[in-house]
């Protein structure tokens, strides 16, 4: 499945970056808001940074990607913790919906975005 391959790629990327990622779908199927919770310990072993990663994979050549209302709300409510991970090769887009709140009215259940527009704004994972 495309999505699981994408999640697996991001899990591996997070581990390579020194984070401790957890696949939320293994805890709760269709976890609302994000796919991966990734943590990093502080210098004294205490819980340090936390990030919530929503992973989007795609079938090769697909022009759009769909983001759910819950995913958008999570990104807007936790802008410094939220990362949208795009997986052809893995790229991270931080603050993906910043300045777009007027586009997401209450009745919206999901939004389609042009993959290339998101991809062009994304960066190498760090």
Roles of regions detected by a PLM:
Residues 1, 24-29, 41-44, 72-75:
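Short, contiguous acidic/charged loop-to-helix segments that flank catalytic cores in large enzymes
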Residues 1, 7-19, 48:
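ASCE P-loop NTPase motor core, strongest for the SF2 helicase catalytic module
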Residues 11, 15-41:
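A short acidic/basic microdomain associated with nuclease active sites
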Residues 14, 35-38, 49-59:
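Conserved catalytic cores of phosphodiester-cleaving nucleases, focusing on short active-site segments
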Residues 42-49, 92:
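Short, solvent-exposed loop/turn segments that connect beta-strands within catalytic domains
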Residues 55-72:
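Short beta-strand-loop-alpha-helix junction that forms the active-site gateway
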Residues 78-126:
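Domain-level recognition of nuclease-like catalytic cores that cleave nucleotide substrates
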